[in-house]
Amino acid sequence: MRIVISHPKAANRELWCAEMTTLLPGATVFAWQPGDPPGQADYAIGWHPGAALFTAVSGIKAFFSSGAGVDHVLGEPGYPADLPLIRLEDAGMARQMAEYCIYEVIRIYHQRERYEQQQRQHVWRELEPPPRTGFGVGVMGLGVLGAAVAGALSGLGYPVRGYSRSPREIAGIACFSGDAELPRFLAGCRVLILMLPLTAATTALVGRDFLAQLPAGAHLVNVARGALIIEDDLLAALDSGRLAGATLDVFGQEPLPGGHRFWDHPRVRITPHVAAITLVAESARQVAAKISKLELGEPVSGLVDRSRGY
């Protein structure tokens, strides 16, 4: 069995090669990048592989995304239409994502930013927290990671509501689905956490009309994909005070350009796409287990429905 690793970062290619060689000692694992000679492989693992991989390396039976999300592959016109695409499921990312979102929700609920302002002004004043029962936290996207985040926040006593394309039932979470229930979902979100996959249906979803359905003074947290948001509309909502703040971990262009207004906006908090970093060792174990199942002719989870984009 031959496994090819394609990743834009050399360090990641080396890590994946080392892990997969250890986990599947009978396999030949090799790295490939544009410009390398043609070859053959049974399985491919990578990130932003580019059309050249599928032209140069023949025999690939399935492609495994080496990070969260598969839009980097679905947006590649050279990706073979009949090649199975398999996504990572958690692989150590759910805990990181939950911690990131919990931190932001706690900061917002307990008004930490206002206390920091008061410190700079030498003001000693206790602030009354809002009633927790009315402090709705919405998680938009209830896949493996979204469901984990919703459950973690619910466990801390926040009233959590979740939204998904298809109906879901999750204990302790008020679940909404479909276009008809979206307005009611948004209306109850004092904090809205975006965890949607990037698809044709979700690209530029979060614009002026969408944001206007959130309660006045709501906060937005985006840990999914930057292209979900129309940036000018978000800035307008922040400038007007319609939104109280936004925490952004992902952007339409990364790294974020130095002159972008997000950098210095007083109502924006920025992190450099670190809400859930791919843990190669855990991810490789998951991929290796799935390859072993495929070799035995057994079904695997995480197979992407390309018509839906996830």
Feature map (PLM): residue ranges:
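Phosphate/diphosphate ligand-binding glycine-rich loop within oxidoreductases
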Residues: D42-E116
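Glycine-rich, N-terminal phosphate-binding loop of Rossmann-like dinucleotide-binding domains
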Residues: H48, G67, L194-L196, V223-A224, ...
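NAD(P)-binding Rossmann-fold cofactor-contacting core
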Residues: L156-G172
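Rossmann-like adenosine-cofactor binding region
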Residues: P167-R261
